Each structure stands twice: as C-alpha cells, then as structure tokens.
C-alpha cells in the first residue's frame, strides 16, 4: 500500500474514533465530564462547592479563559455572570449550549 493510502485510512479511523468518543461524552453532564480529569477537586476546593461559586468560576477560567477573551456571546456578560449561571455543570449535558432566550425574552439570538 502507498503511504498516501495508509495515511488516508489512518485519518479516517482516527476521525471515527474521535466522533464516537464525542458522542459518548454528549450523554454526560459537564460535571461528569470534568470529574474524569481528576475528581471533584478539578472544579471545587477540597471537592466541596463554595458558597458563592467564585472558586469554581476561577477554575473554569483557568482552563477555558475569561469571558472577555471568549466569543461575542460571552463578552457582554463579563463582570456580570459566572460560567455556572448559564452552563449549569451538574445539569447541562456536554455539547449543550444555552440560548439567549433562556434569560432574554426580547427575541435576540446568538451571532
């Protein structure tokens, strides 16, 4: 077999493998997905939720960046909301995205 054919077969196999793991992850909540990376301590100090959510918000930003650094849908919320206000980690599934009308009833949509 030629190197091009082997490369194409490898790429196709890798793509199928990645899609199947993404499909599997979509059945998990955000918390279940993140706990696999090292336990509840990934998000919570000593594995316990903080009273105000500030520690958890810092943990989100340490991996995903600040709201100001994100896309246009996140920037307007910088300084006003924490990640968990929209992305309820123990309820939302991996890949689910909150919509504007979850909080806004004026017909706006994400760009």
Swiss-Prot record:
Its main location: periplasm. One of its GO terms (molecular function) is metal ion binding. It is found in: Periplasm. Disruption phenotype: Mutant lacking this gene grows well aerobically and its growth rate under anaerobiosis with a variety of electron acceptors is indistinguishable from that of the wild-type parent strain, except that respiration with Fe(III) as sole acceptor is severely, although not completely, impaired. The keyword Transport applies. InterPro entries: Multihaem_cyt_sf (IPR036280), Tetrahaem_cytochrome (IPR012286). Heme c 3 binds at residues 74, 83, 86-87. One of its GO terms (cellular component) is periplasmic space. Heme c 1 binds at residues 40, 43-44, 90. Heme c 2 binds at residues 34, 60, 63-64. Gene3D superfamilies: Flavocytochrome C3, Chain A. Residues 1-25 form the signal peptide. Binds 4 heme c groups per subunit. Pfam families: Cytochrom_c3_2. Its cofactor is heme c. This is Tetraheme c-type cytochrome. It comes from Shewanella frigidimarina (strain NCIMB 400).
């Amino acid at each position: 077999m030629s190197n091009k054919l082997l490369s194409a077969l490898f790429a196709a196999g890798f793509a199928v493998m990645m899609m199947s793991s993404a499909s599997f992850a979509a059945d998990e909540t955000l918390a279940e997905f993140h706990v696999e990376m090292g336990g509840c301590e990934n998000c919570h100090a000593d594995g316990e939720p903080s009273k105000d959510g500030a520690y958890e918000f810092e943990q989100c930003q340490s991996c995903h960046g600040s709201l100001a650094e994100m896309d246009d849908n996140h920037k307007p919320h910088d300084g006003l909301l924490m990640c968990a206000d929209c992305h309820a980690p123990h309820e939302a599934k991996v890949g689910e995205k909150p919509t504007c009308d979850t909080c806004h009833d004026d017909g706006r949509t994400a760009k």
